[in-house]
């Protein structure tokens, strides 16, 4: 979320506070409903549906909308990290972020892997090993 939003509205301290904010929703093509945001803290896990005037269908569209000041987005930390460090976005509810144990790629190990495939794996390692909790 952009800093200007929090000049008018209090920064959310708990997930339920999002119900008083304009949030950027997402609807992925494989589902008909809006995605419920997932939260986790200590042993408490739950999902929360929020309201907002903007609905995106991808993470990049959510990011663009947040950068344009359209609301609070729910996007992966590794996507937002550079914008947070530059001050273009503000992270909220970080203590409620669910643990993400990373991506997993499964492929046959008995065949000869091409240099292109090995380069692809290295790009994924370089990109996603930084900043993911």
Question: What does each model-identified segment do?
Answer:
Residues 1-24, 42:
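Flexible hinge/capping segments at coil-to-helix
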Residues 3-5, 29, 42-44, 109-111, ...:
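Short loop segments at secondary-structure junctions
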Residues 8-9, 26, 83, 92:
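Residues that scaffold the ATP/ADP-binding catalytic core of kinase and kinase-like folds
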Residues 16, 63-64, 118:
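Alpha-helical segments flanking ligand/cofactor-binding loops in enzyme cores
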Residues 24-43:
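Secondary-structure junction motif
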Residues 77-86, 96-133:
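C-terminal effector-binding regulatory domain of bacterial HTH transcription factors
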């Amino acid at each position: 979320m952009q800093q200007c939003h929090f000049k008018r509205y209090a920064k959310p301290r708990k997930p339920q506070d999002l119900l008083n904010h304009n949030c950027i929703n997402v609807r992925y093509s494989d589902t008909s409903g809006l995605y419920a945001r997932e939260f986790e803290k200590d042993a408490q896990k739950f999902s929360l549906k929020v309201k907002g005037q903007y609905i995106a269908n991808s993470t990049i569209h959510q990011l663009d909308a947040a950068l344009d000041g359209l609301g609070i987005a729910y996007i992966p930390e590794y996507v937002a990290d550079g914008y947070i460090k530059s001050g273009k976005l503000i992270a909220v509810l970080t203590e409620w972020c669910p643990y993400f144990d990373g991506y997993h790629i499964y492929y046959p190990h008995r065949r000869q892997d091409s240099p292109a495939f090995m380069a692809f794996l290295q790009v994924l390692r370089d990109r996603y090993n930084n900043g993911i909790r």
